[in-house]
């Protein structure tokens, strides 16, 4: 939409085409998403590549679907945009295009996503399998590939529900669903042949030294004993942890609910072979990152984490070593996030958020270990 306004079209006309009843509605949604007004954003020197309405229509013409369906950006229920390269088309379809951004999905990961979705579908899981183009291809292959799928019924759980009175119950549902997903992924892993990530060497060889620098630079207050404890104790546990094909990105936006139950998972672009604990812990930190404005965040997040662990363990029992390693895997995720976001200029604010999260997690070490040991 922004590129069309920049091209000289009237803002109200563009807003109406993109499904807003008024320009005011478009303006509010834009500010909520980008943090500034459309006018200010037009003058930014770095604007991500955007598709015009006409360009998206030309892409969709390659599929045998009604060509007058509305095209809208995808938002999770509390208003945050999921991605700049994914759109809903009518009520049934999802269009995804290859992204330019280094930290977004690339061609290989999109094709891997197709493979996993097809294999999960064959296992009886709800999955976004591709709709063939008019020529019978699974995707449109051009300068950028485009994939059209039928959306899985459901929406990400609202923040109000994640942190609400039923947070422990919803935590259990997250954990149970990840456990069922892991059972299916373990079956299909030989067909997918995923790349393997050694979490321990990845953190100790890169992320941990970077966080050490930031600990000094930003006066985070993490003691030297935190880093040494991680190296020593997680080093002993790591080789004993079960590893398999995992989702890798089960943040709340990628887990859909319908009627209060998990209806499916989306976006397997980052899937890899890693410790299976990663998905449980990543789900919990993905929820924690929305902590601002939540009263009693300490107790509420620990309730959610306890629910996730309990739900997973009831379906796919955790080993003793996994229970001991929960805290270290959560810290691994946070150190990776802190190191990565600080290295990308436009994401430094996210680095700050993740530093605060890491500080909070370290403060909660005893409680986190108690939760996992009580399973």
Predicted stretch roles:
Residues 336-375:
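ATP/Mg2+ or Mg2+-diphosphate-binding catalytic cores
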Residues 80-95, 231-278:
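Active-site acidic catalytic loop and adjacent metal/ATP-binding pocket
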Residues 277-316, 331-349:
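Active-site activation/catalytic loop segments of kinase-like enzymes and analogous catalytic loops
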Residues 1-19, 45-49:
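Terminal helix-turn-helix DNA-binding modules in bacterial transcription factors
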Residues 164-221:
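A cross-family kinase active-site recognition segment
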Residues 56-63, 187-190, 205-248, 317:
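An alpha-helical support segment within catalytic cores of ATP-dependent transferases
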Residues 25-26, 30:
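Short hydrophobic/aromatic patch on the recognition helix
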Residues 91-188:
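ATP-binding pocket architecture of kinase catalytic cores
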């Amino acid at each position: 939409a922004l590129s069309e306004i920049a091209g000289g079209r009237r803002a109200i006309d563009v807003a109406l085409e993109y499904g807003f009843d008024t320009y005011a509605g478009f303006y509010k949604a834009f500010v909520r998403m980008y943090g500034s007004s459309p006018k200010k954003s037009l003058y930014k020197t770095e604007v991500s590549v955007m598709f015009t309405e006409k360009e998206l229509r030309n892409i969709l013409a390659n599929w045998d679907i009604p060509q007058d369906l509305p095209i809208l950006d995808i938002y999770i229920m509390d208003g945050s945009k999921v991605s700049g390269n994914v759109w809903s088309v009518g009520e049934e379809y999802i269009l995804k295009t290859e992204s330019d951004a280094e930290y977004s999905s690339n061609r290989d990961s999109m094709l891997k996503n197709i493979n996993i979705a097809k294999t999960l579908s064959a296992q009886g899981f709800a999955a976004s399998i591709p709709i063939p183009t008019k020529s019978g291809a699974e995707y449109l292959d051009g300068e950028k590939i485009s994939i059209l799928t039928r959306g899985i019924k459901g929406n990400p759980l609202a923040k109000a529900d994640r942190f609400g009175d039923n947070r422990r119950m919803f935590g259990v549902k997250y954990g149970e669903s990840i456990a069922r997903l892991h059972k299916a992924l373990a079956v299909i892993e030989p067909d997918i042949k995923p790349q393997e990530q050694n979490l321990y060497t990845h953190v100790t060889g890169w992320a941990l030294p970077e966080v050490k620098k930031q600990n000094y630079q930003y006066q985070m207050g993490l003691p030297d004993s935190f880093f040494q404890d991680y190296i020593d104790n997680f080093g002993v546990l790591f080789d004993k942890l079960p590893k398999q094909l995992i989702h890798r990105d089960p943040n709340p936006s990628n887990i859909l609910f319908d009627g209060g139950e998990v209806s499916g998972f989306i976006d397997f672009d980052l899937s890899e072979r890693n410790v299976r604990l990663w998905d449980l812990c990543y789900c919990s930190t993905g929820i924690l990152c929305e902590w601002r404005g939540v009263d009693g965040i300490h107790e509420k997040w620990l309730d959610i984490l306890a629910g996730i662990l309990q739900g997973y363990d009831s379906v796919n029992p955790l080993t003793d070593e996994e229970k001991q390693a929960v805290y270290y895997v959560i810290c691994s995720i946070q150190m990776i996030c802190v190191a990565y976001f600080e290295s990308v200029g436009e994401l430094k604010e996210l680095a700050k958020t993740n530093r605060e999260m890491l500080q909070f997690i370290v403060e909660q070490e005893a409680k986190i270990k108690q939760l996992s040991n009580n399973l």
